[in-house]
Amino acid sequence: MIQQQTYLNVADNSGARKLMCLRVLGTGNCRYGEIGDVIIAVVKDAIPNMPIKRSEIVRAVIVRTRQPVRRASGMSIRFDDNAAVIINNDGNPKGTRVFGPVARELRDKNYTKIVSLAPEVL
């Protein structure tokens, strides 16, 4: 569950390290974001000399959450951190690599590019 003011790690090589969620995009008054949801975030920490700078407003898709996610089979999956991948307006990732595992729910939400870049899909 990602809400406003939540800090997330960045799971790609776009240049940002930490994000803070400003808004969860969705229908109506979306308070919490789950895996596969798009958020508006501000970059709180960035690597020097990279295209994405600190205090820049970006779009990102949530790829890992500490809150357990229930699947239709009854199994639940939980990750060690909250993480997101920065995307452009078309929904494609800005980075060329994705670090760490991502959830299978991303494939259902048509983020196949992120799933193909990830080293492991759980």
Curated annotation (Swiss-Prot):
<dbReference type="GO" id="GO:0006412">
    <property type="term" value="P:translation"/>
</dbReference>
<dbReference type="GO" id="GO:0003735">
    <property type="term" value="F:structural constituent of ribosome"/>
</dbReference>
<keyword id="KW-0687">Ribonucleoprotein</keyword>
<keyword id="KW-0699">rRNA-binding</keyword>
<comment type="similarity">
    <text>Belongs to the universal ribosomal protein uL14 family.</text>
</comment>
<protein>
    <recommendedName>
        <fullName>Large ribosomal subunit protein uL14</fullName>
    </recommendedName>
</protein>
<dbReference type="GO" id="GO:0022625">
    <property type="term" value="C:cytosolic large ribosomal subunit"/>
</dbReference>
<dbReference type="InterPro" id="IPR000218">
    <property type="entry name" value="Ribosomal_uL14"/>
</dbReference>
<comment type="subunit">
    <text>Part of the 50S ribosomal subunit. Forms a cluster with proteins L3 and L19. In the 70S ribosome, L14 and L19 interact and together make contacts with the 16S rRNA in bridges B5 and B8.</text>
</comment>
<comment type="function">
    <text>Binds to 23S rRNA. Forms part of two intersubunit bridges in the 70S ribosome.</text>
</comment>
<dbReference type="GO" id="GO:0070180">
    <property type="term" value="F:large ribosomal subunit rRNA binding"/>
</dbReference>
<keyword id="KW-0694">RNA-binding</keyword>
<dbReference type="InterPro" id="IPR019972">
    <property type="entry name" value="Ribosomal_uL14_CS"/>
</dbReference>
<dbReference type="Pfam" id="PF00238">
    <property type="entry name" value="Ribosomal_L14"/>
</dbReference>
<keyword id="KW-0689">Ribosomal protein</keyword>
<dbReference type="InterPro" id="IPR005745">
    <property type="entry name" value="Ribosomal_uL14_bac-type"/>
</dbReference>
<dbReference type="InterPro" id="IPR036853">
    <property type="entry name" value="Ribosomal_uL14_sf"/>
</dbReference>
